[in-house]
């Protein structure tokens, strides 16, 4: 549950947040304001989806693991994926890795391939992790954008949303409305990501990916109330 900071308004936190939060880049030590506390972004972002650049060349391309069943990533293919085809391909391939089927194959190797396939599936099925992975395929760190410099109005919008959540925490109806509004924001960001990636506008894509990550965090906060 959100906790009130005494009788103080949320507004006094803004100047402090701008100095201590929003003037830092979104890296492993970046902090995000949530539930009237500061949390490091690396506690929110699942870095297990990403490899270092040195490891990426050795890892299997997630899209190629489902080659022939889903389209190529942007800009060659669309951002959207046929989720039904992705799931069917995943389940079919997982069956071939089952110990009863993969006879003669090293058990450890089959287990590794199964883990890689699951990781690829879980990454590609969700818009945010898919977008982050596509950026990585382009050699772009998906959590490197400094939103504090590129989109200060967006940061103020986030602060307003947190304030609205705090004011509505005892009203299920208002919280539901805030959740629906946040879903609309996420759809809008995904639309912008789609347009940017399919036109090879990677700077814009990175900006909107980071915006979507913030709205996903708002989802988590609302879900936990």
Swiss-Prot record:
Residues 61-137 form the J domain. InterPro entries: HscB, HscB_C_sf, HscB_oligo_C, J_dom_sf. GO terms for biological process: [2Fe-2S] cluster assembly; protein complex oligomerization. It holds the Pfam family HSCB_C. One of its GO terms (molecular function) is Hsp70 protein binding. A motif (HSP70 binding) lies at residues 98-100. Keywords: Chaperone, Mitochondrion, Transit peptide. It comes from the Eukaryota. GO terms for cellular component: mitochondrial matrix; mitochondrion. The keyword Phosphoprotein does not apply. Its main location: mitochondrion. The keyword Chaperone applies. Residues 1-49 form a transit peptide. It is found in: Mitochondrion matrix. Disruption phenotype: Inviable. Interacts with ssc1. Belongs to the HscB family. Co-chaperone required for the assembly of iron-sulfur (Fe/S) clusters in mitochondria. Stimulates the ATPase activity of the mitochondrial Hsp70 chaperone ssc1, to mediate the transfer of iron-sulfur clusters from isu1 to grx5. This is J-type co-chaperone jac1, mitochondrial. It comes from Schizosaccharomyces pombe (strain 972 / ATCC 24843).
């Amino acid at each position: 549950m959100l906790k009130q900071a005494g009788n103080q308004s949320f507004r006094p936190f803004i100047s402090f947040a701008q100095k201590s939060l929003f003037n830092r880049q979104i890296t492993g030590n970046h902090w995000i304001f949530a539930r009237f506390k500061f949390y490091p972004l690396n506690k929110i972002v699942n870095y297990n989806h990403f490899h270092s650049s040195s490891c990426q060349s050795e890892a299997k391309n997630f899209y190629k693991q489902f080659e022939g069943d889903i389209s190529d990533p942007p800009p060659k293919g669309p951002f959207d994926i046929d989720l039904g085809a992705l799931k069917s391909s995943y389940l079919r391939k997982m069956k071939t890795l089952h110990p009863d089927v993969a006879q003669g194959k090293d058990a450890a190797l089959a287990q590794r391939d199964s883990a890689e396939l699951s990781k690829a599936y879980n990454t590609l099925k969700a818009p945010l992790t898919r977008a982050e992975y596509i950026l990585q395929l382009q050699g772009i760190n998906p959590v490197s954008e400094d939103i504090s410099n590129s989109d200060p109005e967006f940061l103020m919008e986030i602060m307003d949303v947190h304030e609205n959540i705090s004011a509505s925490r005892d009203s299920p109806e208002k919280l539901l409305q805030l959740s629906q509004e946040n879903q609309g924001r996420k759809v809008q960001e995904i639309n912008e990501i789609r347009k940017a990636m399919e036109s090879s506008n990677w700077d814009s894509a990175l900006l909107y990916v980071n915006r979507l990550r913030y709205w996903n965090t708002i989802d988590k906060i609302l879900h936990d109330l």
